[in-house]
Amino acid sequence: MKQLKSLSAFLMSLLLMVSCSNTDKEDLEVKPIAASGEISSFFDKHLPSQSSTPASDFSFGDKSECMIINSVDELRRSVSSQIDKLPAIDFTKNTLVLGQARMSDPGFSFKKQSVTINDNTLTVHLKFEKNKGATPTVITYFYYWGLYDKLPEKPTDIDLNIE
């Protein structure tokens, strides 16, 4: 009987230690950093906030897409060959997130974006707000970009949130 009590006490203490030592890492959420005037001006000029057709200055198709850009070569491949001058981005320290969200109508406002990093993936979170009032039913592309401190290269998911 004494051995059974000792074994029970040992198992209970072991269970307590395991339950208190949670090794799961929290997901890390990061927000875009301030971009230079040159970078902001480039995207203001070449990337509309919304359009009824995919942006011709970038290599987007006709669906929602997100590009995680970590080099000048990747940026060059994402833009039209008619754009000669790219903004100076230090890709040793930064990552550019660039994309389009295909929506059912133009009645949305883009509110914010962030990226969550976990062990397996990057998740780009996009938050839109539904505007009040009637809007025509026409496919509309919303565009976004964000400059981040260097992000790890991992598979990417998109989380589109409409409020």
Model region roles, listed by residue range:
Residues 1-18:
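Sec-dependent bacterial lipoprotein signal peptides
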Residues 20-163:
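Exposed, flexible binding/inhibitory loops of compact, secreted disulfide-stabilized domains
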